[in-house]
Amino acid sequence: MTLFLIDTSAWLFNFPPRVVPEIRERIVELAKKDLAGITSPILFELLQGARSGQEYHRLLQHLLSLHQFPVTASDWLKAAQWAQRLRVRGLKAKTVDFLIAYKAMRHRLVLLHADGDFDRMARLVPLKVESCLKFVRAP
């Protein structure tokens, strides 16, 4: 059973007004099969975007039903060291993306995303990814 960490970049296409049916179906499929996971930075990014208190609580309830991969102090330090090595090799990405990728690698999760930075990381390190970019980029 392979678990997935669903990045914010994929989640955004699960919610109106930006729904992409293929991405939404994949997220729903993973959740129904109990294969979907989340980590605290993604939880934060999604919850802070709620448009009302009611939406916040509904979203929180749903997200907390997923497999949880909290970030520890040790994770921050190890992810920073890992990111530094990748930056020296020329890879540029947002700090939080390095942390999320590190969590996925550490727990051997497949990272479902719509962010090209993760594909670039996966070319350099043993990060397993499933890209949704083909569904959101114009041909």
Regions found by a protein language model. Give the residues of each.
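Short, well-structured N-terminal submotif of metal-dependent ribonuclease cores
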Residues: 1-38, 48-61, 136-139
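Acidic, PIN/NYN-like endoribonuclease modules and their adjacent C-terminal/linker elements
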Residues: 2-3, 101, 105-139
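A generic structural signal for short hydrophobic patches within well-formed alpha-helices
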Residues: 11-12, 43-46, 118
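A general structural signal for well-ordered alpha-helical segments in protein cores
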Residues: 24, 39, 43, 56-59, ...
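Structured helix-beta-strand junction loops
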Residues: 32-34, 62-66, 89, 107, ...
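A short acidic, often aromatic-flanked loop/helix-cap motif at beta-alpha or helix-coil junctions
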Residues: 45, 74-78, 134-139
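Short, hinge-like loop/turn segments at secondary-structure boundaries
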Residues: 53-57, 86-87, 128-132
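Active-site neighborhoods of divalent-metal-dependent phosphate/nucleic-acid chemistry enzymes
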Residues: 67-114
